[in-house]
């Protein structure tokens, strides 16, 4: 998955936004964010097909895990999207504050799922407010944070292959009966006047 973080984030956000009415209205294309879906230039000769299969497995596992996460904490996410008060000037600050709180005391796969869910929520809120020019910027913030902050931990803990092993093939849905498998608590707090998402996950 080296060099494919942007592809993964773009496809994840695009898939999520395709379910959102506010975003679909901006384009008749089934893909609501065609300007984000640029072909990757990171593939080595002969690796495209294999890498594509791996990326699809990661994307599917990530979609299932975030869907389960958002379903589990539906009320919290509803409150979050209605109270974020996102503007062109405050979006990046809100993103940075939430990330600082989310990973303040460490990283685990559950918090990485929460990271993607929050990025999606931020994109949906921006689309709802017709600030679609924010979408590629949010994607870039996610890519930067993923590559520069989260990847060292991920590489030390088995990489995306380990994530697929934990959350792939509908494992997230099967974990509904086990609180330890998908986390302990989602809380929402005020941070310097900005409504932020804080998720404390128990290590698997």
Curated annotation (Swiss-Prot):
Pfam families: Bcl-2. It is found in: Membrane. One of its GO terms (cellular component) is mitochondrial outer membrane. It is a single-pass membrane protein. The chain crosses the membrane at residues 181-198. The keyword Membrane applies. GO terms for molecular function: BH domain binding; channel activity. InterPro entries: Apop_reg_BclX, Bcl-2-like_sf, Bcl-2_BH1-3, Bcl-2_fam, Bcl2-like, Bcl2/BclX, Bcl2_BH1_motif_CS, Bcl2_BH2_motif_CS. A motif (BH2) lies at residues 152-167. Keywords: Apoptosis, Membrane, Transmembrane, Transmembrane helix. A motif (BH1) lies at residues 101-120. GO terms for biological process: extrinsic apoptotic signaling pathway in absence of ligand; intrinsic apoptotic signaling pathway in response to DNA damage; positive regulation of apoptotic process; release of cytochrome c from mitochondria. The keyword Membrane applies. Belongs to the Bcl-2 family. Confers strong protection against cell death. This is Apoptosis regulator R11.
């Amino acid at each position: 998955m080296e060099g494919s973080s942007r592809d993964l984030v773009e496809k994840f956000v695009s898939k999520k936004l395709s379910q959102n009415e506010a975003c679909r209205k901006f384009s008749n294309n089934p893909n609501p964010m065609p300007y984000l879906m640029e072909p990757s230039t990171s593939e080595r000769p002969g690796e495209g097909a294999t890498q594509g299969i791996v990326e699809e497995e990661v994307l599917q596992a990530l979609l299932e895990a975030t869907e389960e996460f958002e379903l589990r904490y539906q009320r919290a996410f509803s409150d979050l999207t209605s109270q974020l008060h996102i503007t062109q000037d405050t979006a990046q600050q809100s993103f940075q504050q939430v990330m600082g709180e989310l990973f303040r005391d460490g990283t685990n796969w559950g918090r990485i799922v929460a990271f993607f869910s929050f990025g999606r929520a931020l994109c949906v809120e921006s689309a709802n407010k017709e600030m679609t020019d924010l979408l590629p910027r949010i994607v870039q913030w996610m890519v930067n944070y993923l590559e520069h902050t989260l990847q060292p931990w991920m590489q030390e803990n088995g990489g995306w292959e380990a994530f697929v092993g934990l959350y792939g093939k509908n494992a997230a849905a099967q974990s509904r009966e086990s609180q330890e498998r998908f986390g302990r608590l989602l809380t929402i707090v005020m941070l310097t006047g900005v409504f932020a998402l804080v998720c404390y996950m128990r290590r698997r």
